[in-house]
Regions:
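Phosphate-backbone binding interfaces of nucleic-acid-interacting proteins
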Residues: 1-198, 333, 350-352, 356, ...
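Short, hydrophobic beta-strand segments
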Residues: 3-7, 154-162, 215-223, 356-363, ...
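Glycine/proline-enriched, intrinsically flexible loops and inter-domain linkers
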Residues: 5, 23, 63, 182, ...
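Conserved mixed alpha/beta core segments that line enzyme active sites in large multi-domain catalysts
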Residues: 33, 49-77, 235-236, 253-322
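Class II aminoacyl-tRNA synthetase-like tRNA-binding/catalytic domains
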Residues: 107, 277-318, 322-325, 486-525
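Conserved catalytic alpha/beta cores of large enzymes that bind or transform nucleotide phosphates
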Residues: 122-123, 129, 227, 296, ...
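Extended, well-folded interaction surfaces typified by the phenylalanyl-tRNA synthetase beta subunit core
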Residues: 173, 406-525
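Terminal amphipathic helices with adjacent charged low-complexity linkers/tails
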Residues: 178-209, 385-413, 417-420, 466
Length: 525
């Protein structure tokens, strides 16, 4: 998973440089696979001024431009319709490697030499507009490197997370770990929405017929939306983590997914028959066309999100072609649910279909995070999609999660870890990652802490899990090297083993060779 440093800084004040931060996170159990300068490829792209535009003698749709880069003038063949004399535009020099992996070389186009390339937003990975070259602000300095001129300096961390840490499959999840490392506060987005009445209940409903597969389903409705490109800052952040911008509504669901770790889905509300949602399993032999335009065979173990008469999504995996957001969509139903991880894993494997959503659902998302995520998405759709929020929220929760209390012995923690933090120090370490210590019980020399893990830590169920958290937060490098606490005693020789070894020695001495067969192979083989 990729996370950009600039995105992390929205939620926490980072006091370390990128290299030290990567080391600290790795030592805390979140392995940083790589640290890269996101805009390194722009070092060979400069701000150029188009000084002259003349027709290409051998091609009607091409022009030949003379571009000033401050200390030199380059001749560039250009096919963009918006190129004009006097404009500033990004000029890629020979040797530039673009985000799609292609490399620019000096070339001859229809008989005319081209010493560079005037670039569009999409070619530079800075947006989705491919209609013409990128027009730069006239106040920029000609000849400056584009990254520095636009302030595009960002570091991207790529993590190799273990399957037991789905809480870190989000920007906020990583920021939470940094907050614990630095002992600083985490700044959450505003998830609140002021609902004065429950208008949504008169427009739609949700019925869960398979609560074992879907313990919770939350939804909100936004109308009068206007589909358009998302603002540059959102597109830029999605691109930084490897997601392709599509439109403002779809981009918002992907943005909230990466921010919170909670997958969302946006339905065209007017394409839902009877304007309602039914969550149930499919029937053997059913078929369904997903968003990638492929027909998928279904079985009775697969969870489907349906409207009043038909399936509209494979629950937790991918939406359907029959309810996707289109240019004409005006009302959007936002889905935010908690699905059974085992169910999603089976469905994803059977269909051979892995998505960002299924990757998170099959590891376990926060069952208490559905409301926060759907509120966040609804607010962004009002702000960036010009939508009107329908007041009220649908929150079907037939199987609430039980509170998991774990008793942690301080004395046993000392014995197993080899470090000796007292009860209050252990309490502070656990509270730094939002664990709740309900009480501390003195029991003679052994003190116990009654700990409630946060709902997003689905991997915590026993005392040893808490000890692991104490160890990594205290620092694995602070655990002293000691001999194992086990008795070292000589055991009497086993007569059978002694006899077997003597026989083997006699047989090999007589010229025999020992054959060791594979395990679980029949004697006849």
């Amino acid at each position: 998973m990729k996370v950009s440093l600039s995105w992390l800084k929205d939620y926490i004040d980072i006091r370390m440089d990128a290299a030290d931060l990567a080391d600290a996170l790795t030592m805390a159990g979140l392995e940083v696979e790589s640290v890269s300068n996101r805009y390194a490829y722009l070092q060979t792209v400069v701000v150029g001024r188009v000084m002259e535009v003349r027709p290409h003698p051998n091609a009607d749709k091409l022009t030949i431009c003379r571009v000033d880069t401050g200390d030199r003038s380059d001749t560039v063949v250009c096919g963009a319709p918006n190129v004009s004399e006097g404009m500033l535009a990004p000029l890629a020099m020979p040797g530039t490697v673009f985000p799609d992996g292609s490399q620019l070389d000096q070339s001859v186009i229809r008989g005319e030499k081209s010493e560079g390339m005037l670039c569009s937003d999409v070619e530079l990975g800075l947006g989705t507009d491919s209609s013409g070259i990128m027009a730069l602000d006239s106040s920029l300095n000609v000849g400056d490197r584009l990254a520095q001129a636009l302030g595009l300096e960002d570091t991207v961390f790529e993590f190799d997370l273990t399957p037991n840490r789905p809480d870190c499959l989000s920007v906020i999840g990583i920021a939470r770990e940094i907050a614990a490392i630095q002992n600083t506060a985490l700044k959450y987005p505003d998830y609140s929405l002021a609902d004065k009445k429950n208008t949504i209940s008169s427009l739609t409903s949700v019925r869960i017929e398979a609560p074992d597969h879907c313990p919770r389903y939350t939804a909100r409705l936004v109308e009068n939306i206007v589909l358009k490109p998302a603002p540059f800052w959102m597109q830029d952040r999605l691109l930084s983590v490897g997601l392709r911008p599509i439109n403002n509504i779809v981009d918002i669901t992907n943005y909230v997914l990466m921010e919170t770790g909670q997958p969302l889905h946006a339905f065209d509300f007017d394409q839902l028959t009877q304007n309602r949602i039914v969550v149930k399993t499919a029937a053997d032999g059913d078929k369904f066309v997903t968003l990638d335009q492929k027909e998928r065979p279904l079985n009775h173990q697969m969870l489907m999100i349906c409207d009043g008469e038909k399936p509209v999504a494979v629950g937790g995996v991918m939406g359907g072609l029959n309810s996707e957001i289109e240019d004409t969509s005006r009302r959007v139903l936002i889905e935010s649910a908690y699905f059974n991880p085992v169910s999603i894993r089976k469905t994803s494997k059977t269909l051979g279909l892995a998505t960002d959503a299924s990757h998170r659902f099959e590891r376990g998302v926060d069952p208490e995070g559905t409301v926060r995520a759907v509120n966040r998405a609804a607010k962004l759709m009002v702000e960036l999609g010009e939508g009107t929020l329908i007041e009220g929220i649908i929150d079907e929760y037939p199987q609430p999660q039980t509170i998991n209390r774990v008793s942690l012995s301080v004395e046993r923690t000392h014995r197993l870890l080899g470090i000796h933090p007292d009860g209050n120090q252990i309490k502070g370490l656990l509270e730094s990652i939002e664990f709740k210590v309900e009480k501390m019980i003195p029991e003679g020399e052994d003190q116990r802490l009654i700990v409630v893990p946060p709902s997003f830590r689905v991997d915590i169920s026993r005392p040893e899990d808490l000890m692991e958290e104490v160890a990594r937060l205290a620092g694995y490098n602070n655990i002293p090297t000691t001999f194992p606490a086990m008795p070292a005693e000589a055991r009497p020789p086993a007569r059978y083993l002694d006899l077997r070894n003597r026989l083997k020695g006699l047989m090999t001495g007589a010229g025999f060779t020992e054959a060791i067969t594979y395990s679980f192979v029949a004697e006849a083989s």
